[in-house]
A protein has these predicted regions:
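N-terminal low-hydrophobic presequence detector
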Residues: 1, 34-36, 474
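Bacterial N-terminal signal peptides that target proteins for export
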Residues: 1-9
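C-terminal motif of bacterial Sec signal peptides marking the signal peptidase cleavage site
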Residues: 16-19
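Flanking scaffold residues of small Cys/His-coordinated metal-binding clusters
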Residues: 12
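Core sequence-specific DNA-binding domains of diverse transcription factors
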Residues: 21-133, 173
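Kelch-like beta-propeller repeat domains
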Residues: 131-474
Length: 474
């Protein structure tokens, strides 16, 4: 397993801070001709993740002369939102070594600010941090052809990724689609869907007859109950059978039989799509109507439904769908109510549930694991920050990458750059390299080479800003 980016970059900061005078130490004579007015923060222009380097911070007066005897308290910040910074420092004799950890490859700066007088501040020049090949992190890749959030991204048998639908910054629901090619890192347009769709499902039909193998089933996200199939052999969408119920923010799960279970989406109804006939048929109802829930295929072929909400109230309940009987039955409840959360099947057959909006309308930092053997949920160590409407992706080494999400209430309605890794062996989350761009309602798709493609999402809600950028977790 690679070393998490959170352990990446150690910066030794040696601070030459001096001024004179009494009180806060920000005024008086000493070696300068007046009190300190700003800091000069000098840093190298380039660095490699994991390679230590030094910066110099000097307290200067308005004539840019060093102010000796400075005794104020300095607060350090960084443009790297995931940086691990030292506590506020009182610098004895104007000089002290400071250790800082930057987590994110890319361009970062470090800022020194006097606590008592915040106008006394200084920012380093940009530090271009290259990714260490032995470390995890995100890197930008080609942008999509247009903005998308609440869309889908589906790995195809040929290794490309079908990105479809969603909404843009103007509130337009989209019918357009495009393909990401990992070999070139670029997106190209493909045929458009018959209907525009948002918060819908896209399911690769991998186990059906030859006529449907490799096709992708698109269901829901419209005012009516339509469905269509994408054929990667010719890049076109064609209509298929009519679903029993319209669905929005529902789930779709490929079963071992090759059929697809569609459940929830502002309803308690459920139905099955049969690729052999192209028809939908009703199956047993869920115990509770729910949307923004999760559906996870378990090792025994049953499907675990967790959480969700109805009438703006999040649930902690869970239920199991048995394909052999076509019925849903209650199982153990989660330790916390959740909607807009994630559920990821682990290699040990258990299910990791993370984040979401809880019953207090807060973004949750908690996580728990469902054990199919006992039908119960148990808590694990919390995440380092809250995540909702985020992504959680099982990596080749068995860890789970949790990325992005909704930040509330500070600032309200903005995306997060936060990312962390869950290790099932220790049941602990560790920070990893942060996203290059804050986002939620995005997608994460694990590619055949083990990398994870992140596409689109919403950057903020006021004003609405939808993204067309994409990045790769390596």
């Amino acid at each position: 397993m690679k070393i998490p980016q959170s352990l990446a970059i150690s910066i030794s900061a040696i601070c030459f801070l001096s001024a004179c005078g009494g009180g806060s130490g920000n005024s008086g004579g000493g070696g300068g001709t007046g009190g300190a007015t700003h800091f000069a923060v000098t840093a190298p222009g380039a660095a490699t993740a994991g390679t230590p380097f030094t910066i110099a911070v000097v307290a200067l007066n308005s004539s840019n002369r060093t102010v000796t005897g400075y005794s104020g308290t300095v607060h350090f910040t960084s443009s790297d939102a995931q940086a691990v910074l030292p506590p506020d420092s009182t610098l004895a004799n104007g000089m002290e070594n400071i250790s800082v950890t930057l987590q994110s490859p890319g361009s970062s700066t470090i800022v020194a600010t006097d606590i008592a007088t915040p106008t006394i501040t200084g920012t380093s020049t940009a530090i271009q941090v290259a990714m260490n090949p032995n470390l995890h992190g995100f890197q930008a890749t080609g942008a999509m052809g247009g903005e998308r959030a609440s869309h889908t991204a589906t790995l195809l048998p040929n290794g490309k990724v079908l990105v479809a639908g969603g909404t843009d910054s103007l509130g337009n629901d989209l019918a357009t689609a495009e393909l990401f090619d990992p070999t070139t890192g670029t997106f190209t347009a493909t045929g458009s869907m018959i209907s525009s769709r948002i918060s819908f499902t896209a399911t690769l039909l991998a186990h059906g007859p030859a006529a449907t193998n490799g096709k992708v089933l698109m269901v829901g996200g419209t005012a009516d109950n339509t469905a269509e199939l994408f054929d990667p052999s010719n890049g076109t969408f064609t209509a298929t059978g009519t679903p029993v119920s319209p669905r929005f923010e529902g789930t779709a799960t490929l079963l071992a039989s090759g059929k697809v279970l569609l459940a929830g989406g502002h309803a308690s109804t459920a139905e099955l799509f049969d690729p052999a006939t192209g028809a939908f048929a009703a199956t047993g109802h869920m115990i509770s109507a729910r949307d923004e829930c999760t559906a996870t295929l378990l090792s025994d072929g049953t499907v675990l439904i967790t959480g969700g909400e109805s009438n703006l109230a999040s649930f902690n309940t869970a239920e199991l769908f048995d394909p052999t009987t076509g019925t849903f039955t209650a199982t153990g409840s989660m330790t916390e109510a959740r909607s807009g959360h994630s559920a990821t099947l682990l290699n040990n057959g258990k299910v990791l549930v993370t984040g979401g909006i809880n019953s207090n309308d807060d973004v949750s930092t908690t996580a728990e694991v469902f054990d199919p053997a006992s039908g119960t949920f148990s808590t694990v160590s919390p995440m380092s920050s809250g995540h909702a409407f985020h992504t959680a992706t099982l990596l080749d080494d068995g860890t789970v990458l949790v990325a992005g999400g909704f930040v509330f209430p500070n600032p309200p309605g903005n995306g997060s750059v936060g990312a962390e890794l869950f290790d099932p062996a220790t049941q602990i989350f560790e920070r990893t390299g942060s996203l290059g761009t804050a986002r939620y309602m995005h997608t994460a798709t694990k590619l055949n080479n083990g990398e994870v493609l992140i596409t689109g999402g919403e950057f903020k809600t006021t004003p609405v800003m939808i993204l067309k950028s994409a990045e790769l977790y390596k």
